[in-house]
Amino acid sequence: KILFLLLITVLVPLTAQVTYFTNVSDKQIKTLQVKVAGEMFSDPFIELGGENRIEVNFDAFNPGFGRYAYNLVHCNADWTQSNLSPIEYMNGFQGSTIEDFANAMGTTVQYTNYRLLFPNDDVQPKVSGNYALQVYNEDDPSQIVFTACFSIFEPMVSVAATVSGNTDIDTNQSHQQVSFAINNKNFPITYPQTDLKIWVYQNN
């Protein structure tokens, strides 16, 4: 099995906050996908300033045509809202609209497919980290129809990792153990126990 290792610098919130996660709150929104554009199955991680983009794709089963807009929220490592203001983490303006859409043809149920690529001409991220894209009906900004979460990473350290079936639990059975070393020569980490959060993801 291939494992994906993700390290994110911790930004500690001052107060308890809402934790963001990908979810749909409007029953008219179906088949929400959040992935790397051009890849069939992928975790929504892209490099800051890289060539890849995040694709958010969904179907809206509205009786009539609906226009959707979105806001971008920068999050801490625990997916609570960070203390950064929009001008600090993005170029562009909140409330941009989703302009890529197409009505379904030849189907028994009428719906509209919407597609958003990020970054785009309207909004670009300035910093790495976790992001929550909140989409709402343009006529009612207070009602979020869904939230799409993704991460933008910045390769500031190098990581050497190994995977072994010889673990503290068992040997070559149902568990795996990951060991890794971080080369942070050009990125000082004063308190690694508290300054870093580490996640290990299984790839597919």
Positions of PLM-derived features:
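Beta-strand-rich interaction surfaces with strong enrichment in secreted/lumenal proteins
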Residues: 44-45, 100-107, 122, 149
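Extended, solvent-exposed segments with strong compositional bias
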Residues: 90-111
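Ligand-binding face of N-terminal immunoglobulin V-set domains in extracellular IgSF glycoproteins
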Residues: 110-138
